[in-house]
Curated annotation (Swiss-Prot):
This is UPF0213 protein PEPE_0875. Belongs to the UPF0213 family. SUPFAM superfamilies: GIY-YIG endonuclease. Pfam families: GIY-YIG (PF01541).
Length: 95
């Protein structure tokens, strides 16, 4: 997966070491994933390192990116997996 080098508004999904999924929002994708892996990200991912970026989507504005994050977090686990598969993400070994 090629990560964009420019800042923007991004919704992203991480696969944690325990095979759980975490959705977030950022303006700097590379920095945010690095921070998650250093234990400086969300409390949820701090105990589930390392994390792997498996999906991201860019938006024109902060509101839309944050809305995508909110909608993802409201989904059930099975719905999150369906969303990722629909967007071309192949998931194996997920609990």
């Amino acid at each position: 997966m090629e990560i964009p080098l420019i800042n923007g508004f991004y919704f992203y999904v991480l696969r944690c070491a325990d095979n759980t999924l975490y959705g977030g929002y950022t303006i700097n994708l590379i920095n945010r994933v690095e921070r998650h892996n250093k234990g400086q990200g969300a409390k949820y991912t701090k105990a589930r390192r390392p994390v792997q970026l498996i999906y991201f989507e860019s938006f024109d504005n902060q509101h839309d990116a944050m809305s995508a994050e909110y909608q993802f977090k409201q989904r059930t686990r099975s719905s999150k997996i369906k969303f990722l598969k629909k967007n071309g993400i192949s998931l194996t070994n997920l609990k």
